[in-house]
Amino acid sequence: MSSSSNLQYEEIPKKYIDPLAPKDKGEGSRVNGKDWKIKKDAFRVKTLGVVSKTKKDSFKQRELKRLEEEQYKARLKELKDEKESAKNQRIADLKRRREIKAEKERYERMATKMHAKKVERMRKREKRNKLLKER
């Protein structure tokens, strides 16, 4: 993209179009000696009007976009964690209820075989051992 690419034909300086147009004295003659050739600009020089995408978006806009993206991701993560914790809580409650039910059934089976007082003593002993083990 040269500096003259986005101009109308009439607006383009003659040095870019007409090879016979008078040269500026400051330019001097060409190194290769081909003075009859048309003057051309460098193909891609950023100072001549090629604007990259990063220059179009200002830093503040990119920063705002990045912050919004971070907030969105944080909120999404928070919702996922909340959902996961609710699921884990339900599972833990279900396990606890099943354990209590299984223990109750076990004591009932023991009660059919043994005397009631002996079952009560065993229950207390197991509870004591469980508390000691958890310490």
Curated annotation (Swiss-Prot):
Query: Quick one: where is this thing mainly located?
Result: nucleus
Coiled-coil positions are: 60-118
Compositionally biased intervals (Basic residues): 112-128
Question: Which stretches does the entry tag as region Disordered?
Answer: 1-33, 110-135
One GO biological process this protein is involved in is: rRNA processing
InterPro entries, per database record: Cgr1-like
Do you know which Pfam families this protein is assigned to? Cgr1
Renumbered to this chain, the Basic and acidic residues biased-composition regions fall at 11-33
- Where does this protein reside within or beyond the cell? Nucleus, Nucleolus
> Keyword annotations for this protein?
Coiled coil, Nucleus, Ribosome biogenesis, rRNA processing
Q: Which GO terms describe its cellular component?
A: nucleolus
Per its UniProt entry, which superkingdom is the organism in? Eukaryota
The family this protein is said to belong to: Belongs to the CGR1 family.
**So what does this one do?**
Involved in nucleolar integrity and required for processing of the pre-rRNA for the 60S ribosome subunit.
Q: What is this protein called?
A: rRNA-processing protein CGR1
Q: Which organism is it from?
A: Candida albicans (strain SC5314 / ATCC MYA-2876) (Yeast)
Supply the gene name.
CGR1
